Amino acid sequence: MYTIAALYHFTRFADPAALRPALLDLCLAREVKGTLLLAQEGINGTIAGPRAGIDAVLAHIRALPGCADLEWKEATSDHPPFARMKVRLKKEIVTMGQPDVDPKARVGHYVEPEEWNDLIRSPDVAVIDTRNDYEVAIGTFEGAVDPQTESFRDFPAWWEANKDRFHNKRIAMFCTGGIRCEKSTNFLLGQGVEEVYHLKGGILRYLEETPAENSTWQGECFVFDNRVSVGHGLKEGPYDLCHGCRRPILEEDKARPEYEAGVSCHHCIDETSDEDKARFRERQKQIALAQTRGERHLAAE
């Protein structure tokens, strides 16, 4: 059984590059895989591995400057969620492209999962999903506004174009684990919105703690690992990935004429060139060859 830990923490790292070697070495030594992002604004990522390995890595992160109060969300999987370990240096741990946004200065009001339903059902509250369009497509909260953004970078422009729709409304925001809302609520406060709320722990904590019969969640929650999606109780869902575009697809989507394993699906068949598709086919061929040798090709991640 693999333990999965999703984490983020905003703090000040004077020299993120200096933190990378020891963190990567520890993960490799303890057979922990996944992706961790380091930037001057903090750390973000999801890792998976044996219980003892995850505990060792979390203890190491909590010992980093300003990370003693690190919080994370856990789940389990009976198959490895990641094929390799990456510790990457970034300008931002979640990219919004707004240099004046600083979640360490102020954020919206945190709302516990058990209080969320009452808030979003209030007539003076507008609920905004801050995730990307392909995530929203497989699940969201009842009544939520979908900005239809392809990237979190698009959110500020969407708000500027649509803010008049939310005049005199309290704003409630949510995302997968909470990190995007740290920035989006700070952004809205900076834009003069007076009452901004966000779901503490994100969708994942809500699904973990809220019984399905009391839930306002509809569908599945997209996750950035080999589980692809989870539902209530963080139970692994029915979705797979199209490895041509990385969008979630169902088993019945694989029966459609646009689907070719590792190459295309109905979402992306018209988005890639013949040259791209030829490259994807070669990649898929190498993955299949690795499988016949009992190996896992890194491109299969």
Question: What are the residue ranges of the model-derived segments?
Answer:
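Internal catalytic-core helix/loop-beta-alpha segment
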Residues: R106-S122
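Short, well-ordered loop/turn elements at secondary-structure boundaries
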Residues: R121-D124, H167-N168
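Rhodanese-like catalytic fold shared by cysteine-dependent sulfurtransferases
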Residues: M1-V107, R131-I171, I179-E301
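Structural scaffold elements adjacent to functional motifs in cytosolic proteins
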Residues: V127-D129
